[in-house]
């Protein structure tokens, strides 16, 4: 639904009635119920999309549920690096719309819109104690910048030019998972991540194609930290306990 942040509707309910889980921890947007906590794709191991008939632990949704697990360490050390670069110079120039059947002043100006992004991911996983204690970790430095004109709503002409940028330590994603196989029937797992982002917004005057003085600014805080501790125990052939 493009009107609600391009979030997905599935399972027969609205976009605000889905739920998202990572390693059993609910990471749905708690303020609005829209979307999930942002995590780099490289951090994931498996995905499940449930649209009905799921157990009580997924009962906080009337729509669908996205259930995911992250990668874990194994008995072999593995390392990886991924670099993604999206320069604004490769984007097509936006259009300009004018009032009075194209003969009037500028109503919408997308020619100044731009987006650039640099995304680097480093990960490592392996045994801290062979067959017993395993670690997997990932860090993701991110650098983004976007500019656009803005008019308040779809019926108002553009009267502002905005620049939004996010970089540095306040925009570093990190995540990790620690698994302790106490014995073949009992496992203790600790999982944590931070997807905090501080976006610096600067607002400038805009009038009929001309960008003026800076008139406002703000720091937009997004994301945060999450962590969980879970236990899985096989008590008998017919009884498994998770907590």
Q: What residue spans do the PLM features occupy?
A:
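Periplasmic N-terminal accessory/gating domains of Gram-negative outer-membrane beta-barrel systems
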Residues: 1-72, 103-109, 117-123
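Outer-membrane beta-barrel translocator domains and adjoining extracellular loop/strand segments
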Residues: 33, 91-98, 148-154, 195, ...
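Transmembrane beta-strands of outer-membrane beta-barrel proteins
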Residues: 48, 80-84, 138-140, 191-193, ...
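Transmembrane beta-barrel wall of Gram-negative outer-membrane proteins
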Residues: 111-199, 219-240
């Amino acid at each position: 639904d493009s009107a609600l942040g391009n979030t997905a509707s599935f399972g027969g309910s609205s976009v605000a009635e889905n739920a998202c889980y990572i390693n059993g921890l609910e990471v749905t947007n708690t303020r609005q119920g829209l979307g999930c906590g942002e995590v780099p794709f490289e951090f994931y191991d498996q995905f499940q999309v449930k649209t009905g008939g799921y157990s009580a632990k997924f009962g906080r949704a009337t729509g669908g549920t996205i259930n995911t697990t992250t990668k874990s360490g194994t008995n072999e050390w593995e390392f990886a690096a991924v670099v993604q670069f999206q320069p604004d110079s490769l984007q097509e120039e936006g259009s300009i719309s004018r009032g009075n059947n194209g003969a009037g002043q500028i109503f919408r100006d997308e020619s100044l819109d731009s987006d650039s992004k640099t995304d680097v991911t480093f990960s490592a996983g392996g045994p801290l104690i062979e067959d017993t204690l395993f670690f997997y970790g990932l860090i993701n430095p991110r650098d983004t910048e976007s500019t656009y004109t803005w008019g308040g709503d779809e019926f108002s002409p553009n009267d502002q030019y905005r620049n939004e940028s996010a970089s540095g330590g306040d925009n570093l994603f990190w995540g990790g998972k620690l698994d302790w196989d106490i014995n073949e029937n009992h496992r203790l797992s600790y999982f944590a991540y931070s997807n905090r982002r501080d976006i610096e917004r600067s607002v400038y005057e805009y009038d009929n194609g001309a960008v003026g003085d800076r008139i406002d600014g703000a720091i937009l805080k997004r994301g945060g930290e999450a962590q969980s501790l879970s236990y899985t125990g096989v008590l008998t052939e017919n009884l498994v306990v998770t907590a």
